[in-house]
Curated annotation (Swiss-Prot):
UniProt-recorded name of the protein: Probable cyclic nucleotide-gated ion channel 6
Protein species of origin: Arabidopsis thaliana (Mouse-ear cress)
Positions of a nucleoside 3',5'-cyclic phosphate binding: 514-638
Gene: CNGC6
Keyword Plastid: no
Positions of region (Calmodulin-binding): 630-645
Stretches that traverse the bilayer: 118-138, 151-171, 206-226, 240-260, 281-301, 408-428
Record keywords, A-Z: Calmodulin-binding, cAMP, cAMP-binding, Cell membrane, cGMP, cGMP-binding, Ion channel, Ion transport, Ligand-gated ion channel, Membrane, Nucleotide-binding, Transmembrane, Transmembrane helix, Transport
Keyword Transport: yes
Length: 747
């Protein structure tokens, strides 16, 4: 529908076959001024103001003048941009798309993914940097300190790959818009999309930290050592790595906190689930153990080097350079080579019997030297042993450490104890916070149950009522898990609320026969107004004679519906309601009546739950609206469905059929009595008029007997007909339910 033509930022739309151009007024920028300047030169008028066809003679001069004018305008435009003139803010994502350079929205999914990957790369970076401390090792055979070349190549390669993520992140920072602080009064705020302002802000905030973090100083030191063969470089490399890695570790570690805070501010949360948050802090604790283990390894090697240096200082055949591998060709090394093993084992022993005083106290580093990890090139065993030592002493706050009097060792132990205390408190606190979010609903339910028990005990409720309250609370918890679904949905926008209600209720509503054949519009209206209800076993939904304030549609469970026709003696009707049935249909008749007042109708039945019941409820006011939609259905199908499933209509139909059947039986019996009477009359007449040879006395007695028989027949017939008529009238007393108004007329 939209395409771009002419200057940048101007869109065109085809309306009724005509192309109409329009420009967003709130997106006007100085960029569009430049584009408009360029577009002006393409119009039919030249700079001198005359028509183009009259200026052909001075085409060369006017062209040069226009070129200079355009360059001057571009210069003024760039100066204005540099001092901040013009509008450089945007609110909507489409404003970012029309910019000349790609500017990312801080809440863009791609940028959020990149930030999460960068946090992961930061964690990997601070995990890789301590591996540089494992490069020095002790050659136990040559009694010298060397550099593990294979491990050095692997570590520097991994560090370089991770630094590439830093460079990519720094490039993204120059193209990521930010919310202007002055626009945070209401809503999201305005995004600053000017690349100059974005770059200025980044340079003033985190650029220096990122630059110090990404400097490849450790790689340069390691590769310089690998490409030189002089053994004296071992000492310089070891000292440089120790200081540079530790110094550069500070900005790398500090960069993680503002980045995670930025993720929480833009994405709302950093860890999507409670388990992810707990695992994140556990990972940080393991990272601290990894750092402590690497420092312990390096300090153990340094402490061993101090002992060797002290022993070498007391021996005239030794110089300090002999203690580092690669110096075998130095002058005087042969004399030292003959005595170094026995001499160093004598002066710096690591396996000393307990009853003897060692010549040199290694303190907390004795375990690293006696285990042989400082002289091993097996990185896996070396790494996990140091990791376990760091985790063990961080968790125990260094309680099992036996230090020497060496100040550096004591300071390291004190720092270890303080760091362990802080990290352990941080880990426990944050893990408790995250894990409590899993059980907060359960705890709220326990508090409510305790309050309910105290209240019932205070009010001295009978045991059966207490049991019903407990059963209802338990059933509601099992169904909702303590979540107030209604309030949760009500806080959402209307269209989203409608879609959620449709997703949750549509399939269940279609199972109700009354709603089965309705159109989508009516079903949406019904779903939007339905409210879920829960009823426990043996609870009464409505009682006969009470006002009906809602119509219930059964989703699960079984109910009993009973009526006595207003308490009339001798009348009792019972039926069962199951999934798909409804009750409270008196309210639908009331809602469809155009002359109904504000008084709610009375219930004609008592409805009791036989099992736990789930239902949807339509209250009276909402049903008024839905019922008004029913009248627009130009079909009798809904009316027939309503009659078929309505308990009122079913009861009336049953009584009506019983009355019709009894009337039929009455007519049959009356017909039979009439035939018997006719037969007896015919027999009596034949006796009288038959000319019998009996005497006149016998004839008189026969006529008298026939008259008495006819009188008894008439009496019995009258009594039976009166009884049948009275029973029929009793059945007909059950009035026909009022007819709902399903017409299409509005009222």
């Amino acid at each position: 529908m939209f395409d771009t033509c002419g200057p940048k930022g101007v869109k065109s739309q085809v309306i009724s076959g005509q192309r109409e151009n329009f420009v967003r007024l709130d997106s006007m920028d100085s960029r569009y001024s430049q584009s408009s300047e360029t577009g002006l030169n393409k119009c039919t008028l030249n700079i001198q103001g005359g028509p183009k066809r009259f200026a052909q003679g001075s085409k060369a001069s006017s062209g040069s003048f226009k070129k200079g004018f355009r360059k001057g305008s571009e210069g003024l435009w760039s100066i204005g941009r540099s001092i901040g003139l013009g509008v450089s803010r945007a609110v909507f994502p489409e404003d970012l798309e029309v910019s000349e350079k790609k500017i990312f929205d801080p809440q863009d999914k791609f940028l959020l993914l990149c930030n999460k990957l960068f946090v992961a790369s930061c964690i990997l970076a601070v995990s890789v940097d301590p591996l540089f401390l494992y490069l020095p090792f002790i050659n136990d055979k040559a009694k010298c300190v060397g550099i593990d070349r294979k491990l050095a190549i692997i570590v520097t390669t991994i560090r370089t790959v991770i630094d590439s993520f830093y460079l990519f992140h720094m490039a993204l920072r120059f193209r990521t818009a930010y919310v202007a602080p002055s626009s945070r009064v209401f809503g999201r705020g305005e995004l600053v999309i000017d690349p100059a302002q974005i770059a200025k802000r980044y340079l003033q905030q985190y650029f220096i930290i990122d630059l110090l973090s990404v400097l490849p100083v450790p790689q340069i030191i390691v590769w310089r050592f690998l490409y030189t063969s002089r053994g004296a470089n071992v000492l310089a490399t070891k000292q440089a790595l120790r200081y540079i890695v530790l110094v550069q570790y500070i900005p790398r570690f500090l960069r993680m906190y503002p980045l995670s805070s930025e993720l929480k501010r833009t994405a709302g949360v950093f860890a999507e689930t409670a388990w992810a948050g707990a695992a994140y802090y556990l990972l940080l604790y393991m990272l601290a153990s990894h750092i402590v283990g690497a420092l312990w390894y390096l300090l153990a090697l340094e402490r061993n080097n101090d002992c060797w240096s002290k022993a070498c200082h007391n021996n005239q055949n030794c110089t300090r350079n002999f203690l580092f591998c690669g110096n075998q060709n130095m002058k005087g090394y042969a004399a030292w080579d003959n005595i170094k093993v026995s001499y160093l084992q004598l002066k710096c022993p690591v396996n000393v019997p307990e009853d003897e005083e060692p010549p040199f106290d290694f303190g907390i580093y004795l375990r690293a030297l006696s285990s042989g990890i400082v002289s091993s090139k097996n990185f896996v065993s070396k790494y996990f042993f140091c990791l376990w030592w760091g985790l063990q002493n961080l968790s125990t706050l260094g309680q099992g450490l036996e230090t020497s009097t060496y100040p550096g060792e004591v300071i390291f132990s004190i720092t270890l104890a303080i760091a362990g205390l802080l990290l352990f408190a941080l880990l426990i606190g944050n893990m408790q916070t995250y894990l409590q979010s899993l059980t907060i609903r359960l705890e709220e339910m326990r508090v409510k149950r305790r309050d309910s028990e105290q209240w019932m005990h205070h009010r001295m409720l009978p045991p059966e009522l207490r049991e019903r309250v407990r059963r209802y609370d338990q059933y509601k918890w099992l169904e909702t898990r303590g979540v107030d679904e209604e309030n949760l949905v009500q806080n959402l926008p209307k269209d989203l609320r409608r879609d959620i209600k449709r997703h949750l209720c549509l399939a269940l509503v279609r199972r109700v026969p009354l709603f089965e054949n309705m159109d989508e519009r009516l079903l949406d209206a019904i779903c939007e107004r339905l409210k879920p209800c829960l009823f426990t076993e043996k609870s009464y939904l409505v009682r006969e004679g009470d006002p009906v304030n809602e119509m219930l549609f059964i989703i699960r469970g079984r109910l009993e519906s009973v009526t006595t026709d207003g308490g009339r003696s001798g009348f009792y009707n019972r039926s069962l309601l199951k999934e798909g049935d409804f009750c409270g249909d008196e309210l639908l008749t009331w809602a469809l009546d155009p002359k109904s007042g504000s008084n709610l109708p009375s219930s004609t039945r008592t409805v009791k739950a036989l099992t736990e019941v789930e239902a949807f409820a339509l209250i009276a006011d909402e049903l008024k609206f839905v019922a008004s939609q029913f009248r627009r259905l130009h079909s009798r199908q809904v009316q027939h469905t309503f009659r078929f499933y309505s308990q009122q209509w079913r009861t009336w139909a049953a009584c009506f059929m019983q009355a019709a059947w009894r009337r039929y039986i009455k007519r049959k019996k009356l017909e039979q009595l009439r035939k018997e009477e006719e037969e007896e009359e015919a027999a009596a007449a034949s006796v009288i008029a038959g000319g019998s040879p009996y005497s006149i006395r016998a004839t008189f007695l026969a006529s008298k007997f026939a008259a008495n028989a006819l009188r008894s027949v008439h009496k019995n017939r009258t009594a039976k007909s009166t009884l049948l008529l009275s029973s029929t009238k009793e059945l007909v007393k059950f009035q026909k339910p009022p007819e709902p108004d399903f017409s299409a007329e509005d009222h």
